[in-house]
């Protein structure tokens, strides 16, 4: 439910779920959920591995978006409140 609301807020079209912006915003929500879970369950190694996988996927999508359109990349970083990836 939160995922759909987040995607709709960040995208122009309601049915847009395949754009890099939509995917990155979905993955950012996922990162926040897993991070809050790990604060309570520090020894949950499966979740730590899942967090690393999600972060890697988000990093690849961010680098793709940076290559393709820097203005969209910068706007997305400001909207989501995340740092730029190291180059």
UniProtKB/Swiss-Prot annotation:
GO CC list: chloroplast; ribonucleoprotein complex; ribosome
Subcellular location: Plastid, Chloroplast
InterPro entries hit by this protein: Ribosomal_uS15, Ribosomal_uS15_bac-type, uS15_NS1_RNA-bd_sf
Transmembrane segments: none
Principal location: plastid
SUPFAM superfamilies the UniProt entry points to: S15/NS1 RNA-binding domain (SSF47060)
Record-linked Pfam families: Ribosomal_S15
Keyword Chloroplast assigned: yes
PROSITE patterns from the UniProt entry: RIBOSOMAL_S15 (PS00362)
Oxidoreductase recorded as keyword: no
GO biological process: translation
Region (Disordered): 1-20
Gene3D superfamilies: S15/NS1, RNA-binding
Family per record: Belongs to the universal ribosomal protein uS15 family.
Record's subunit section: Part of the 30S ribosomal subunit.
UniProt-recorded name of the protein: Small ribosomal subunit protein uS15c
Organism: Zygnema circumcarinatum
């Amino acid at each position: 439910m939160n995922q759909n609301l987040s995607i709709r807020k960040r995208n122009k079209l309601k049915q847009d779920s395949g754009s890099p912006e939509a995917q990155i915003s979905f993955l950012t929500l996922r990162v926040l959920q897993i991070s809050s879970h790990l604060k309570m369950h520090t020894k949950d190694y499966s979740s730590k591995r899942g967090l690393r996988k999600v972060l890697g996927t988000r990093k690849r999508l961010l680098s793709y978006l940076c290559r393709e359109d820097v203005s969209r990349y910068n706007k997305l970083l400001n909207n989501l409140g995340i740092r730029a990836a190291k180059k």
